[in-house]
A protein has these predicted regions:
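Short amphipathic alpha-helix segments
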Residues: 141-159
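Active-site beta-strand/loop microenvironment that shapes enzyme catalytic pockets
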Residues: 78-127
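C-terminal regulatory domains involved in ligand/effector binding and gene-expression control
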Residues: 1-76, 181, 197-208, 213
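A common structural junction motif
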Residues: 47-50, 157-161, 190-197
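Hydrophobic side chains in well-ordered alpha-helices
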Residues: 36-39, 116, 150-153, 184-187
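Short glycine-/aliphatic-rich beta-strand segments at the starts of folded cytosolic domains
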Residues: 128-146
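Terminal, non-globular segments
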Residues: 174-183
C-alpha cells in the first residue's frame, strides 16, 4: 500500500521584514534531491545579490533525506531551524529557501532563529498543506433534474469535487480515496436511485487539502 504523505500545495513565496532585513521565503514541492538542489540553485541565481540564501528540504515518506544549509549565517541559526519547521508541520518532499537582504541591524542568534523559522512557518501557512492519498478519479454524469439534491448533499461529504462540465447533461469530476470507494457508490445510489453514469480512471496519488494548525 502506498503511504500517504503531507506536502505543500504548490510553489509559493512570501516576504517578512524584520529590523529592516528582508526575509523572502520560497517553498516548492519536490520529488527527489536533484529537484531540491535545482530549486536552491535557481533561487540563488535569482537572488545572487542577497546576503544569504539559506535552505532546507525533506525527501521521502519517512523523511529519509533531510538537509539544511546556513549559507554563511552563524551555525545553527538558519538552516536547522528551517528544517525543524518542515518536520514539526510534517511537510515531506518539499524544499524551502529563505533569502535575506541584510538591513543593517544585527538580530543576534535568537533573533535569526525566530526570523528564519518564522518565514518558513508563514510560507507554509500561507499556501497550505495537502495530503497525497491514493484515490480514484471519477466522472459522474447526471441529468439536470438530479443535480440540485446531488450537489447539496455532495458538499457535506469528504468526496473531493474538482470540476464540473455542462452539455446535455452535467458531469462531475470527483476524486475518491480508495478506502471510501464503496461508500461513494452507496452515496451515488442513494442520491440518484441508481440512475447515473460513472467513469473510473486509474487510481493515483492525489492532493487533498488539510488544515495547517
Amino acid at each position: 500500500m502506498t503511504q500517504n504523505i503531507i506536502t505543500v500545495k504548490k510553489e509559493h513565496i512570501i516576504e517578512n521584514v524584520i529590523s529592516k532585513s528582508r526575509f523572502i521565503a520560497h517553498i516548492k514541492p519536490v520529488q527527489n534531491e536533484d529537484e531540491a538542489k535545482a530549486f536552491i540553485a535557481a533561487i540563488k541565481k535569482e537572488h545572487k545579490d542577497a546576503t544569504h540564501n539559506c535552505s532546507a528540504y525533506t525527501i521521502g515518506p519517512e523523511m529519509n533525506i533531510q538537509k539544511a544549509n546556513d549559507d554563511g549565517e552563524p551555525t545553527g541559526t538558519a538552516g536547522v531551524p528551517m528544517l525543524d519547521i518542515l518536520k514539526k508541520l510534517d511537510v515531506h518532499n518539499a524544499c524551502v529557501v529563505v533569502t535575506r537582504y541584510f538591513g543593517g541591524i544585527k538580530l543576534g542568534g535568537g533573533g535569526l532563529i525566530r526570523a528564519y523559522s518564522g518565514a518558513v512557518r508563514d510560507v507554509i501557512y500561507d499556501i497550505g498543506r495537502v495530503e497525497l492519498r491514493e484515490a480514484v478519479p471519477c466522472i459522474v454524469t447526471l441529468n439536470y433534474d438530479q443535480t440540485g439534491k446531488f450537489e447539496y448533499k455532495l458538499a457535506s461529504t469528504h468526496f473531493m469535487l474538482r470540476n464540473q462540465t455542462y452539455t446535455d447533461k452535467v458531469s462531475y469530476y470527483i476524486d475518491v480515496v480508495k478506502s471510501d470507494y464503496e461508500a461513494f457508490i452507496n452515496f451515488l445510489n442513494q442520491m440518484t436511485a441508481g440512475n447515473f453514469d460513472l467513469t473510473e480512471e486509474t487510481p493515483k496519488q492525489l492532493p487533498f487539502d488539510i488544515p495547517t494548525e
